[in-house]
């Protein structure tokens, strides 16, 4: 079989930078899926993407589908011939349809009978006749929420398309992509190199674009180049560039020929909290801030131009002029905000509605304050600081700085709290109340911060559920799933001795009569328990382990986590499989018992050696298990219980539980019930697979 390399490029207007990677990856995934469906062999496939192009390169693509033998089964031999042994009309019709005679048909014998069969050879179709249609189908399936039309064209895409190139080796493949005929024409950089050129061979794509068109089409190469050059530029001025991957991705998606440059701003702006300056540089301008070795912001920034200029100083000056007004705004807002304390802004919270039925932001901070103090008392944190931090928690939302630079909420609250002379615990809680903000983010670690963060999230959860607006499907306008995961993570990762039932009840109490849903507390608890399952699954914990713990309904998240870890460890023990099966057997036996289960074991009724041994082993372990259960040392408890394997196996081998003698039967049921109860102190291990 012959092979050749394939290149497909779509030339467009500037594509959305935050969608570029996803578009390219989806294009590749969709196209390779088409190749697989068409039984076209290939060695490897990669995607390329730049602001004005999406491309795919497939290496060693088969030039045709492999020939196949297709089995075409006909009628059963019993019905293919009449009494005289002549072919029936049905058999002749089937044979004619396959281009053979009945006599040429083969016989297939199965356990269900004998059949006429024709093994037809089907020649593979040439790849070049399939590619264009496959590429179009791959494009049709791209995740484009809002496609657009352009010119008089009825075709829709995320941005206008100008060129399409499909090359199989050196051969131009005829066809259309999004209404554009395939041609060798490839567009270069807007301002450098050749505006367009003819591509002779699929293998020349990257090199020709770089040399002739001044475009680095390989996204990952472009990204790596920007990162390396930015790091070098920062090192030259004695600093380290803040190169966040999401920003690096966006910048790499904005330029085709990256040129890294260093600029500066007036040192007077460093009097403004660095977070506000960084927000402006990264969020608005897509610049990389630079910090010194002590983590202090330097009056410099690194940016990426999309052109190799003969006068880079002019480009640097232009970028400095662009950022200066934004930094001046931040300075003005900061100086203006400092004239008023956070406490003085409390009345203004009454003018902002949190939710129609749940009141204003002032109502919310009052509830957060009370709930934070309640939580702090249970965790040993400073309740006075927790109440104060809760009260002030949303006041920075009324500052000029946060209104203009919304992502600085909490952070600016921390800075303003320090300027107001609030305690450090209160100031830090102002910032950490929103943690964790995203998957993988850190959680608050200080006691006051934990109390405020939990209070804020629980107030929202109970309030929104309380007015009947729980998330439905994918819709979650109040980000309740994130809040729920946040509650669990804060409690688990800080090992806080908090009970969800108690917290939910207190939050509901603080909402007073505003909640219309009588089942709110139960629904919030169920919602949180469901998040446990999702969270632990994301961490790679087996579903059966999670279900085994969920069966016990532990409502203390830290305790839940201890049980998960213990059961996960138990599963690694050699005895776990047999004991899980035994517990399942015990559960099935006890489930059939009518009425209350017997609980008292009479030693005089233990007539079999195996049941005597099991009872003795349980009696030996129970004094050791009791303190372990009391201290939530579930891992050690299950390790001890694993030692019951031989006794349990022997019991089921030798003892008839459902004996005819009622007293013996009940005594054995009591023994099994006692056995099961020891495991149920931790989890229902009968659910382990």
Swiss-Prot record:
<dbReference type="InterPro" id="IPR006194">
    <property type="entry name" value="Gly-tRNA-synth_heterodimer"/>
</dbReference>
<dbReference type="GO" id="GO:0005524">
    <property type="term" value="F:ATP binding"/>
</dbReference>
<dbReference type="GO" id="GO:0006420">
    <property type="term" value="P:arginyl-tRNA aminoacylation"/>
</dbReference>
<comment type="subunit">
    <text>Tetramer of two alpha and two beta subunits.</text>
</comment>
<dbReference type="GO" id="GO:0006426">
    <property type="term" value="P:glycyl-tRNA aminoacylation"/>
</dbReference>
<keyword id="KW-0030">Aminoacyl-tRNA synthetase</keyword>
<dbReference type="InterPro" id="IPR015944">
    <property type="entry name" value="Gly-tRNA-synth_bsu"/>
</dbReference>
<dbReference type="GO" id="GO:0004820">
    <property type="term" value="F:glycine-tRNA ligase activity"/>
</dbReference>
<keyword id="KW-0963">Cytoplasm</keyword>
<comment type="similarity">
    <text>Belongs to the class-II aminoacyl-tRNA synthetase family.</text>
</comment>
<keyword id="KW-0436">Ligase</keyword>
<protein>
    <recommendedName>
        <fullName>Glycine--tRNA ligase beta subunit</fullName>
        <ecNumber>6.1.1.14</ecNumber>
    </recommendedName>
</protein>
<dbReference type="GO" id="GO:0004814">
    <property type="term" value="F:arginine-tRNA ligase activity"/>
</dbReference>
<keyword id="KW-0067">ATP-binding</keyword>
<keyword id="KW-0648">Protein biosynthesis</keyword>
<dbReference type="Pfam" id="PF02092">
    <property type="entry name" value="tRNA_synt_2f"/>
</dbReference>
<dbReference type="GO" id="GO:0005829">
    <property type="term" value="C:cytosol"/>
</dbReference>
<dbReference type="Pfam" id="PF05746">
    <property type="entry name" value="DALR_1"/>
</dbReference>
<keyword id="KW-0547">Nucleotide-binding</keyword>
<dbReference type="InterPro" id="IPR008909">
    <property type="entry name" value="DALR_anticod-bd"/>
</dbReference>
